[in-house]
Amino acid sequence: MHEHLKEKLAILPDQPGCYLMKDKQGTVIYVGKAKVLKNRVRSYFTGSHDGKTLRLVGEIVDFEYIVTSSNLEALILELNLIKKYDPKYNIQLKDDKTYPFIKITAEKQPRLLITRNVKKDKGKYFGPYPNAQSAHETKKLLDRMYPLRKCTNMPDKVCLYYHMDQCLAPCVKEVTEEQNKEIVDEIIKFLNGGHKEVRSELEIKMYEASEKLEFERAKELRDQIAHIDAIMEKQKMIMSDLVDRDVFGYAVDKGWMCVQVFFVRKGKLIERDVSMFPIYDEPEEGFLTFIGQFYENSSHFKPKEIVVPGSIDSELVERFLEVEATQPKRGKKKDLVELANKNAKIALEEKFYLIERDEERTIKAVDHLGKQLGIETPYRIEAFDNSNIQGTNPVSAMIAFIDGKPAKKEYRKYKIKTVQGPDDYESMREVVRRRYTRALKENLPLPDLIIIDGGKGHLAAASDILEDELGLYIPMAGLVKDDKHKTSHLIIGDPPEPVVLERNSQEFYLLQRIQDEVHRFAITFHRQLHGKSVIQSALDDIPGIGDKRKKVLLKHFGSLKKMKEASVAEFVEAGMPKNVAETIYTYLTDKKTL
């Protein structure tokens, strides 16, 4: 530990506040809060920690702290600091999961809408609904039952909805404020849980229509009742008080936290939200940070009541969110909290089980591959592939797999420099020479296995450079494809002998992933270079276009096709003088063969 850190730790105050952990560049990498700064900050540098926390602590070279007057103030400040610095070790809930609401607009002639964006306007919002289908089914029923206007813009004449008795036609008729209010009140009653009452009213109307021999009307009312029954069946009542509430539960294991939220609306459990993230604080502190961010997210509407587990300070939550927060000791709410806790625990167990299974499969695949090839377990595998089209823009690519997983920071791209024309073998010689000469000079980690995407000639070329020129003896195998360009088998040794793997084995799947990945990486790099060269060669003969302007045009348009479709104004917008823009436009439109 740095000496200045020890000195700062020694003078930490025993007061609430926030702390900001910094790395060697001075970047804030983590923001936390504490009831007692002295105890919390010191805990990072003492005792044992899980792997994730050890990585965080390993990067800390300095910290700052801000003393606050209360835990509530610390919670508010923490959220603001996280938004300001966006530290890489803090959770940041993404605003990408939104739920649909039904909205009654505040227009003079109100409408029913489905929206995922709750605004602070005069409209009335109902929800959230678990999914778009549920919201649309409810709106469709309401549209049939209550004749609010349907059109976004008022038409000049009545539409089909009027003839279906689903609109009062305010476009051509006078619909009073009182009429609209009566309809809106009925809709609100329905959306606030008055399904049974509305159903009873419809039943009475259905029998009346039947007695009057209005069988078509009676059938329509019967269908509406059936739709209400279907909606009620999907939203079983779990609480009788009809209060909108969010019920929270959480679990912590192996440095991860899972928080589950049950959305209860009008007494019905309609949806659940699951969030999982690494945690570096005490569980209670991590939960408070989560719940603060959860309701800052515009897609999460604050209900009338928030229900939290017994370990959480409900008074602090209530003051912070300005919503009633309860900590139930018994009854249905306590049962729901325990159910949320249980679901969170199960979700974490499932996550770790799947991770362990995946790791077990990949490690076994690597181990079995080594045994099949008669070598030590190849924990680090490097694979090479060449790419060119008729010798133009020849490139090569190298990828690395460590413990059976792609290590993308280790990937490398190579422009072929010494080879003229389409010579795959010489290209392979060059790239193997460049890769491992540098590895020796810079003392970089060497692979346990090298895979060359190719046959005997490619393998011989690479082996010649590696062993005869560089004096390296690393196991090397050629990856041979079938006539459909799919993974077939490996060849290894001198002379090369085929090693056939079971096609349904994990080691064969590993080879397929390696082959697909190195090919993808090489071909993507080649296309980038080829696209640039095509554009640049197409621009070579245009007066006034030098290398600098070629780069500007390439960056702005990205492809020759887009340049050929561009107007003079768009070339000017890209930074070309008007006379040059006109020249480019004329040249590219005349050159039909480009």
Curated annotation (Swiss-Prot):
Single GO MF annotation: excinuclease ABC activity
Swiss-Prot/TrEMBL keywords: Cytoplasm, DNA damage, DNA excision, DNA repair, Excision nuclease, SOS response
Entry-linked InterPro entries: GIY-YIG_endonuc, GIY-YIG_endonuc_sf, GIY-YIG_UvrC_Cho, RuvA_2-like, UVR_dom, UVR_dom_sf, UvrABC_protein_C, UvrC
GO cellular component terms listed in the entry, alphabetical order: cytoplasm; excinuclease repair complex
Coiled-coil boundaries: none
SMART domains per record: GIYc (SM00465)
GO biological process, one term: SOS response
Pfam short name (any one): GIY-YIG
Occurrences of domain UVR (ranges): 196-231
Superkingdom of origin organism: Bacteria
Ranges where the GIY-YIG domain occurs: 14-91
Major place of residence: cytoplasm
Function: The UvrABC repair system catalyzes the recognition and processing of DNA lesions. UvrC both incises the 5' and 3' sides of the lesion. The N-terminal half is responsible for the 3' incision and the C-terminal half is responsible for the 5' incision.
HAMAP family: UvrC
PANTHER family reported in the protein's UniProt record: UVRABC SYSTEM PROTEIN C, UVRC/OXIDOREDUCTASE
Membership in a protein family: Belongs to the UvrC family.
Description of how the protein assembles with itself and partners: Interacts with UvrB in an incision complex.
Name under which the protein is recorded: UvrABC system protein C
Naturally occurring in which organism (per UniProt): Bacillus cereus (strain G9842)
Gene: uvrC
